[in-house]
């Protein structure tokens, strides 16, 4: 199977050909990782089987539609996508952009667990490696290996991850907390339990919409930040990588699409740095801060932004 966003190229020795541009972008595929003709480990088959299952489940959506089922999916989108992944997995855990009381942190994290994007230790580790090695051969999901790989192909390629990060030593802050180790060891039971509860609550329609539709919707929105936001959009800051600000991804992902801003100031709890850059996650963080639940909220100072903008201007002149 070929990357549909890349002009067809001949394969060579089991590797996909490099140095092809992704359509409608200036991103050149320089990596040679073969997405299909490689060794598939047991975990790769398991992850691919699960992802296939939820996509097939979602195909029943037109035949099981009710407004109640749709509402379950929409609320699930907000809880797992906005609260769980964007605000908690990403801005809180991966970047320490803010602090929450432990009871609230763990509650919000659990919504992220139900997004079925792996346990917090795995997710945060991969994301921190992404920032450490962004758009290099050691990046976890860069489009230099093609759109498909950066979007979701990397999820099915544990060999690629093991080759580069055999020991995940960048999440010791999470490993020392029993809650996160418990979630890691019992992860799939929480996903299966969620599915069972949805079925018991509303039958097959709730399972289709609350598990299938909601899960793949949040999947692909999250994955678009990894793929589209490193391919299409604009760069306000010279970050030395492919990160882009993409307005339509930002609208769908509660502010995550202001990705070039994020790579310029990865510690910032605010991604939409301009007044017109809608960042729903930031608005929620500000609310939590106003009522005393969010503390140590980090944002770049005007001096830091000026320094970065000056650096960007100087590099543009060279």
Where are these regions (language model features)?
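Active-site-proximal inter-transmembrane loops
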Residues: 171-178, 232-258, 264-265
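Asparagine-centered polar/low-complexity signal
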Residues: 226, 260-261
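Non-catalytic, topology-defining segments of multipass membrane proteins
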Residues: 1-223, 228, 268-318
């Amino acid at each position: 199977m070929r990357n549909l966003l890349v002009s067809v190229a001949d394969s060579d020795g089991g590797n996909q050909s490099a140095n092809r541009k992704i359509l409608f972008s200036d991103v050149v595929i320089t990596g040679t990782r073969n997405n299909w003709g490689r060794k598939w480990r047991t975990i790769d088959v398991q992850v691919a089987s699960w992802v296939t299952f939820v996509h097939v489940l979602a195909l029943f959506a037109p035949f099981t539609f009710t407004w109640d089922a749709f509402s379950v999916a929409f609320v699930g989108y907000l809880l797992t996508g906005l609260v769980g992944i964007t605000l908690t997995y990403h801005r809180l855990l991966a970047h320490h952009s803010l602090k929450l009381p432990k009871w609230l942190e763990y509650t919000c994290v659990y919504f992220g667990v139900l997004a079925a994007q792996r346990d917090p230790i795995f997710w945060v580790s991969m994301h921190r490696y992404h920032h450490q090695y962004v758009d290099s051969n050691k990046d976890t999901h860069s489009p230099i290996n093609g759109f498909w790989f950066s979007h979701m192909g990397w999820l099915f390629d544990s060999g690629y991850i093991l080759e580069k990060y055999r020991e995940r030593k960048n999440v010791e802050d999470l490993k020392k907390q029993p809650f996160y180790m418990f979630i890691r060891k019992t992860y799939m039971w929480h996903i299966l339990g969620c599915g069972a509860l949805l079925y018991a609550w509303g039958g097959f329609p709730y399972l289709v919409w609350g598990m299938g539709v909601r899960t793949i919707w949040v999947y692909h929105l999250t994955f678009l930040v990894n793929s589209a936001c490193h391919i299409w959009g604009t760069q306000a800051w010279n970050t030395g990588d492919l990160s882009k600000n993409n307005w339509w991804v930002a609208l769908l992902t509660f502010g995550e699409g202001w990705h070039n801003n994020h790579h310029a100031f990865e510690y910032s709890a605010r991604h939409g740095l301009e007044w017109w850059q809608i960042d729903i996650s930031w608005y929620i963080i500000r609310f939590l801060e106003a009522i005393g639940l969010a503390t140590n909220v980090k944002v770049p100072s005007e001096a830091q932004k000026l320094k970065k903008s000056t650096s960007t201007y100087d590099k543009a002149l060279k």
